[in-house]
Amino acid sequence: MLAFLVTAAAAQGSEAQFNQRQAKALNTFAKKAFSKGFPRIAKIVWLKTIKLYDSDNKVAWTSLGYVKNGNSWVIDPKRPYPTKDTGKGSDGKPLESKYRALEKTLANNHRNAAKKYAKADRQDLALKHWQMVLRWVKNDSEAAAALEHKEIGGLTGTDLEKTLYDRSKMIEKAIEVQSKTDYETETVTGIECPPLDRAQIPYITVTSEHFTLHGAPDQEENLHKSLKWAERTLVVCKAAFPWSYRDSKWPTQWACVANKDLFKQTLKANDVPDLEWKMENTTGSVIGSTKVTTTPGVQTMYDSCVRNVAQGYSGFGSAGYREGIGHTFVGQMFQNNRLFAVDRKKQEGTSASEEDLEFKSPDFDVWKTLSLEMAWKSTGGVHANEIPFCEASNFTNEERIKAWSFTDYVMRRDPEMLRTMDRIAQDMKKRRAKQPLEFEKQFNEKHSDVTIPQLEKEWEDFWTEASPVLKAIRKNTPPVSAISKGVDKWLIAFNKERKKYNRATVTWSANFSTRCKDHALYLKNNKKERGPAAEHTQKVDLGGSYATSLFAHMAVVQTGAKVGKAKKVFQNWVNLPGYRDMFINHTILTIGMFVEDDILVINATSGIGPPKDKGAGFDCFPPRNDTNLIFDRQVPVALLGPEAEKLLADNGRAGNKVIGFPLTMHFGSSGGIPFRGNLRCQVTDKDGNAVEGVLVYDDGEIRTTTAPGMAAFWPLDPLPKGKVQFIWSWSKDGNAGSSKGAFSAK
């Protein structure tokens, strides 16, 4: 017995020394990344030090801006951790090479330790080290053999990983197939919408096989598209959930109103409970058998319909799991989330660090980064046993991210577990019993083979990509590999162009550049995919992905890009309203950018937030007042793409090669245009004659003609030469406003 204790103590001491060496290696790299100006990359590495090797590592904790208080580490308010990347693009490749070398070194150390412990007949420690080998390298035959892994998608892994992989791929495939599947929808009469009738709001009704949707007459096309997405989601739900749905009309109807004023009008007319609170804090409410939602943009309308189907099909009733499953499906379908149980502005104050702003981003990749950092943290955060007790009226940012990411994980594992959790949560809420340990106990009685703490550990492993299979499911491009040479020079030129329009400078983020790299490489590998339509999508059969295709819709792309001609490139973008938005939009604070040879890709949608300029809000272009600016009177349709072609065709000008120079209003919001339905634009020539045109909202899918939160007035013909006058007008909360200006067309 004494010999065993001595051996165990020796092993423990050896493990401690081993962990210290691994921690030191990670800390060295983190310091290098930090000193080079990449604090977010360094942060993840220091969190790995703490999580994987030394929970009390002084170097890592203090570097992250913490101070020791007794036995705990707490944030030091005197040393806030920086979040903005300031490094040079030329440092990217060397830094990535160092990290790849570090991964190999860490894996080799674990491999040697595993072999040593196997010879010493310490299989417990040997298996632990073999598992860690696979955390650091893509594949290892010795580790796979020792762990008795099975073949999974060209890799090896455990039975659980096979379940996660197979279900994830099944859901991804269902979404990809459904995204291309059409469904019949029709505009009908004779179906009433009592909530809108009481509010005296005009509407039309669109139906599909299973769903009924009411909305504004001028949004007929969007209503049809939204119901098609609802039908697609129903098919995906049938694949994702093991329980069935009675194939009949949905029990509730849906109604979409274009702005918050109309939503308030509807709530008042229907005398809903908690009226004042709902008007101030929510964007959706169930009134009778109708779900009414504020949808100022088509993407928000899609979000609403997909969320309604996912939440209804799941049957979840508790706030945490209901919100979680809604975010899960919307995120997987669109890579964005725009609707929440409660308006986030009521929860977040005015903090404006990059991390705080990320909680406001609809970008699903940003959410994944937040979940990743949450999973790496060894203390604090929201625990899985707290999700059942989340309150819809007071969802914190951290609760929302954890509810979504945990629900997303467990849905991949076994949705029946989610249904059990939700039922227990609803029962405990009825009994007003807020007891996390009791929740865990009841769950374990239903699922004896797994515990909530075990699921939480699995959630951590999934989001931190603890094995090659989990990495293959996540398919993430690490930020350290998204730093491209020359990006800092492009950023300088970009900010010079913004300064020309009196806009604040923006910062660059490696985190926001990962999808930029993915799309740049896709375009590099597919040189025939050129032009506005092809450059703003990806084809799976050409090596693209459904998720990155969605990113490409709103990415800014320039092929044949040379940094020496950056000024000219940016000046030409004034003719492309979606690209123009980057220079006029006050809410763009941080961008992603990647350069691959002569291909430039910019992400201008992830890093949005409150404007740096005090008093800055929405604004028009050309600018208000008469600034004596001169613009081309027309834009070639070939530069704009199919959305401009369709606009001309819909207005009796099919085949025209040019369209008038567009006027734009930039709201900078990601969830649509708040004045939708209440916004007008009038354009006249020097003699006061009206210029015929069409006002278009942010409903498109090609960045050349569309940007989130941007409205565009398209003159259908080339503008008349000479002075052109315009007036934008709107109303909100019963108050009217306007912006007037003039410019010259040549």
Language-model-detected regions and their locations in the chain:
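Surface-exposed patches in mature extracellular/periplasmic domains of secreted proteins
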Residues: 41, 238-254, 314-322, 337-344, ...
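Pro/Ala/Gly-rich low-complexity, hydrophilic intrinsically disordered segments
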Residues: 56-112, 119, 125-206, 456-484, ...
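Juxtacatalytic substrate-recognition/specificity segment
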Residues: 201-322, 326, 335-336, 397, ...
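Functional surface patches built around histidine and acidic residues
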Residues: 474-685, 725-728
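Extended, polar beta-sheet/loop recognition surfaces of beta-rich domains
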Residues: 669-671, 731-746
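Acidic/His/Gly-enriched intrinsically disordered linker/tail segments
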Residues: 268-288, 316-475
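Acidic/histidine-rich, surface-exposed loop or edge segments in extracytoplasmic proteins
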Residues: 25-29, 91-96, 202-224, 474-481, ...
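Surface-exposed, short loops/turns at beta-strand junctions within beta-sandwich domains
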Residues: 716-722
